[in-house]
């Protein structure tokens, strides 16, 4: 089978390419240039070239910087401007890795696209990985349903420690087993605010309000805050911790309150991404990557919006983040929180 492998220069994509080549597939590597972070690509491309030469496979360098800027980078900036919390990895998977890269794979005549994600596929549904601590099904849940039939995740049945051990047994790949793992957001060096600073003044002080609308303090600029944050703002006369409940970007205000006020029992989605045919769901939902799943009921409307009612309340639901719905270990839907 002719397979395009997304290669980053990391241990996961390297072992993915190695395993598929060893199984006798016709493997082609591809490195994606997504952003212009200084010295980032040169080092990675050297690693990809080293692996490609060792495996005796061809590889391509695909410049997707313009697509990435339009579909991931600027929406990241704009979402923070709107006082919401973006999910760039989910957008990148849908539009870039499982979008533009898949188009490129098809243009080369490849039957499948393989990535080093920790996830599995079964009956055209994404499943959680064997290694729960590294499971990436949450970020893949934004994928177009039609893309799933072209995908392979060879590491889905492996634990990360075994992937590293495997690489360490092969002389040429030993260095990949010990290299530092990449950060979650590839274009963020230290903090997201440093990215925003390139486009706007993020340090404009504003008012802190309590939930009744009373001014109780000051903050250093609304873009420094996300829902649930409890530091970096002043609350006069507070005797218990206060958390960000809401952000009003136009007024440069943040509304704060107690942990109890952070509780949410229902929320809405727009443009639900369904992997099964349904008008309602009785399932579990994750409201952020590292959160535990919570039982819920989902009502889906004609315009693809949805209302979610939670069995137990959650804390710190952030508008702009992705909610992912599971039937046990299978992803059945996803959508961005309004």
UniProtKB/Swiss-Prot annotation:
One of its GO terms (molecular function) is tRNA binding. It is found in: Cytoplasm. Pfam families: tRNA_Me_trans, tRNA_Me_trans_C, tRNA_Me_trans_M. Keywords: ATP-binding, Cytoplasm, Disulfide bond, Nucleotide-binding, RNA-binding, Transferase, tRNA processing, tRNA-binding. The record marks 117, 321 as: Interaction with tRNA. Residues 134-136, 288-289 are annotated as: Interaction with tRNA. Its EC number is 2.8.1.13. It is an enzyme of class 2 (transferase). The active site is at residues 92, 186. ATP binds at residues 6-13, 32, 116. The keyword Transmembrane does not apply. CDD domains: MnmA_TRMU-like (cd01998). GO terms for biological process: tRNA wobble position uridine thiolation. Disulfide bonds join 92-186. Its main location: cytoplasm. Signal peptide: none annotated. It catalyses: S-sulfanyl-L-cysteinyl-[protein] + uridine(34) in tRNA + AH2 + ATP = 2-thiouridine(34) in tRNA + L-cysteinyl-[protein] + A + AMP + diphosphate + H(+). One of its GO terms (cellular component) is cytoplasm. Belongs to the MnmA/TRMU family. HAMAP family: tRNA_thiouridyl_MnmA (MF_00144). Catalyzes the 2-thiolation of uridine at the wobble position (U34) of tRNA, leading to the formation of s(2)U34. This is tRNA-specific 2-thiouridylase MnmA. It comes from Campylobacter jejuni subsp. jejuni serotype O:23/36 (strain 81-176).
